[in-house]
Design a protein with these regions (language model features):
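Ligand-binding loop in jelly-roll beta-barrel domains
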Residues: 89-108
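Short hydrophobic/aromatic-rich beta-strand segments that constitute the beta-sheet cores
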Residues: 52, 69, 103-105
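Short histidine-centered beta-strand/loop micro-motifs
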Residues: 33-34, 50-55, 71, 77-78, ...
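Short, conserved beta-strand element in jelly-roll/cupin
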Residues: 54-69
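Short acidic-glycine-tyrosine-enriched beta hairpin
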Residues: 73-89
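A short, N-terminal "cap"/entry segment at the start of jelly-roll beta-barrel domains
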Residues: 2-42
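Conserved short histidine dyad/triad with adjacent acidic residue
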Residues: 26-28, 36-55, 88-89
Length: 108
């Protein structure tokens, strides 16, 4: 069921030719459980700055920390602990990890 939900979610956004970062600042525990977020891989990063290009769509749930992400040609967004985020395939961005980052993530 988790894969079906993710597939539907991504199909909807791919149909819209998603080019922006999508942030849910207050996802419900039900949504996180349905997506199986707790079983996703975990990535940690110390405060730093670096470019990041997405070859695949990434869904992520931030457990700790804060990052400022600036999409190429777009406005900077701040992503914090508790946020659920979708970074679209093809996104070119610059990241500034301002507080030690820990996130669950999944590529599709």
């Amino acid at each position: 069921m988790n894969r079906k939900l993710i597939a539907v979610f991504l199909r909807i956004f791919k149909g819209l030719h998603m080019t922006q970062i999508i942030i849910d600042h207050n996802p419900s525990q039900e949504k996180l459980k349905e997506l199986g977020v707790s079983s996703w891989s975990i990535w940690d990063c110390e405060p730093s700055k670096f470019p990041l290009d997405f070859g695949m769509t990434e869904s992520a749930y931030v457990l700790e920390g804060e990052i400022r992400v600036t999409p190429q040609g777009g406005e900077t967004v701040v992503i914090k602990a508790g946020d659920f985020v979708v970074f679209p395939k093809g996104l070119k961005s610059n990241w500034e990890v301002t507080k030690q980052l820990k996130k669950h993530y999944k590529h599709s």
